[in-house]
Regions:
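An N-terminal-biased, well-structured beta-alpha scaffold segment characteristic
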Residues: 2-95, 217
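Short beta->alpha connector loops at strand-helix junctions that form conserved
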Residues: 32-33, 53, 75-76, 91-103, ...
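Rossmann-like adenosine-cofactor binding region
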Residues: 56-63, 175-271
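Phosphate-binding beta-alpha-beta segment of Rossmann-like dinucleotide-binding domains, i.e.
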Residues: 90, 98-146, 150, 158-165, ...
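Rossmann-like dinucleotide-binding domain for NAD(H)/NADP(H)
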Residues: 90, 94-95, 218, 227-347, ...
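Oxidoreductase and adenylate-handling cofactor-binding alpha/beta cores
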Residues: 106-125, 145, 164-168, 298-311, ...
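Hydrophobic/small residue at the entry helix of a nucleotide-binding pocket
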Residues: 155
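A conserved regulatory-domain signal marking ACT and ACT-like small-molecule sensing domains
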Residues: 321-533
Length: 533
């Protein structure tokens, strides 16, 4: 008997049939692939859910036309093709499958290591050309070699476990992993430069952020052993591709395996294509296994089914588990919590062991858990980028050994709408920031390390701690002016005259590393931190 559903789901990219069968349990499923934006806008208003892969662009215009839409499901990890902020504003849940391709991506990195070590692609090409080059392609064993893992998340951890089972010694760089967690994995934590100097193989498992873009450049490559090899199956843009090509040609390193690129597809004139030996290239195949495609389809289809049945989603990219009314009411507070978390992480540096949230005044009357999640998302996203969302932030914090404490003080009346204070404790000391939401939803930073300030957050900021003495503000302003850095705003907070003070500058452009060193060199300045919000 044909079942009729009031609920409709649009599948606009090719999805594994296992996912379609799950959706068929609760909705009418229409599969229409290859739609243009205008075509999608023309039909999306009829649908309660949309399931996509990377092909469909879910723009603000598409979301505006989706008057019935409750959920967008991305069968995969990345959601760059979805306007998540607009979806959040419209109360549309966005979900993905952050773990569905973990094994596939990890195994591809390992396959790259083995292919590089035994020259598999080049030997195969020689056989196809009629050659028998046994001497030319003498390789190396992985056994008893040192593997350096940059990023000990789910994928990096799986690579580490398999590598250990093959007899490799594993070292890792991940400032957000607790030492005891690494010890449980029998992985030695080290600094990034030490890892590159020591490792025979380096595998990258980090997101692309402002801090990781071109992280692996010519200078870092020159610190590696000439016999070392590097693999990137994480995100394009974290390695300088021209520098990689040159390093292999000049014998600075023995080889590289790349699956992802700064711009995809890889340009025909890319210098990587001209490297004849020691380089293995694949066209972004990390998640391209039958099992991974089935896993992500099932995972996301189950989440869409659950949401349509009124149940929570397990991998929401935007705020989960809140009604549209509560979400709208708390939106400025959650934005403040995320901003403070992002700010304090950049001030703290190093590994944060504990984060304490102090809810004061009216803030104490609101549900605390959404604020905790938002704060953790901010705290971790400075290093982990878009891989952190409102669902996995708590899990990622727990995996990194970060303890969360909550304190509520409804009696506090420092601001009409209350305030939120976040304190971190870690291997580089304690840091504290406080903020409030003013009239009209305006966010304000009201104290830093107990120094009172009144600062509106901006995209680029510079924080300093200095001695309160004549001339420092003028020297800093002159230095920034000499380097063509425009100051948009400035606040100074102090407790006593001519004691210690903090200075907060809103600036129009990021501070380059060389300029930051010059700032720190000013007499009386004790520390300086550039912050991106």
């Amino acid at each position: 008997m044909l079942r009729r559903f009031m609920t409709k789901v649009l599948v606009s990219d090719p999805i594994d049939q296992a996912g379609i069968e799950i959706l068929n349990q609760v909705a009418q499923v229409d599969q229409r692939t290859g739609l243009s934006e205008d075509e999608l806008i023309g039909i999306i208003g009829d649908y309660d859910a949309l399931m996509i892969r990377s092909g469909t662009q879910v723009t603000a215009a598409v979301i505006a036309a989706a008057t019935k839409l409750k959920i967008i499901g991305r069968a995969g990890v990345g959601v760059d093709n979805v306007d998540v902020p607009v979806a959040t504003q419209r109360g549309v849940l966005v979900v993905n499958s952050p773990e569905g391709n973990t094994i596939a991506a990890a195994e591809h990195a390992l396959a790259m290591m083995l292919s590089l070590s035994r020259h598999v692609p080049q030997a195969h090409a020689g056989m196809r050309d009629g050659r028998w080059d046994r001497k030319k392609y003498v390789g190396n064993e992985l056994y008893k070699k040192t593997l350096g893992v940059v990023g000990l998340g789910k994928i990096g951890s799986h690579v580490a476990r398999v590598a250990q089972s093959m007899g490799m010694e594993v070292i890792a760089y991940d400032p957000f992993i607790a030492a005891d967690r690494a010890q449980q994995m029998q992985v030695q934590l080290t600094e990034l430069d030490a890892l590159f100097r020591t490792a025979d193989y380096v595998t990258l498992h980090i997101p692309r952020t402002k801090d990781t873009e071109n992280l692996v450049d010519a200078d870092l490559l020159r610190t590696m052993k000439p016999t070392a090899r590097i693999v990137n199956c994480a995100r394009g843009g974290v390695v300088d591709e021209s520098a990689i090509a040159e390093a292999i040609r000049e014998g600075v390193i023995a080889g590289a395996g790349l699956d992802v690129y700064a711009s995809e597809p890889l340009a025909e004139d890319s210098p990587l294509r001209a490297v004849e030996r020691g380089l293995v290239l694949t066209p972004h195949l990390g998640a391209s296994t039958e099992e991974a495609q089935e896993n992500v389809a099932i995972d996301v289809a189950e989440q869409i089914r659950d949401v349509l049945l009124g149940l929570p989603a397990r991998s929401a990219v935007n705020i989960p588990g809140l009604s549209a009314e509560i979400m709208e009411r708390l939106k400025p507070n959650l934005q403040l919590a995320e901003t403070l978390g992002l700010l304090v992480s950049q001030l703290a540096g190093g590994h944060v062991k504990e984060m304490e949230l102090r809810f004061q005044g009216e803030f104490a009357s609101h549900p605390s858990q959404p604020h905790v999640i938002a704060s953790l998302k901010g705290l971790l996203s400075a290093a982990l980028g878009d891989s952190i969302n409102y669902v996995n932030a708590s899990l990622e914090a727990k995996a990194r050994g970060i303890q969360v404490l909550e304190v509520k003080d409804e009696s506090s009346r420092d601001f009409a709408g209350g305030s939120l204070q976040i304190t971190t404790r870690g291997d580089q000391g304690n840091r504290s920031v406080t903020g409030a939401v003013f009239a009209g939803g305006e966010l304000r930073i009201t104290s830093i390390d107990a120094y009172p300030v009144n600062v509106t957050p901006s995209s680029h900021m510079l924080f300093t701690r200095h001695r309160d003495m004549p001339g420092i503000i003028g020297q800093l302003g002159s230095l920034l002016g000499e380097h063509n850095v425009n100051i948009a705003s400035m606040q100074v907070g102090r407790k006593i005259v001519r004691g210690d003070a903090v200075m907060v500058l809103g600036i129009d452009d990021p501070i380059p590393a060389s300029l930051l060193q010059a700032v720190i060199a000013i007499e009386g300045i004790q520390e300086a931190h550039p912050v991106a919000l």
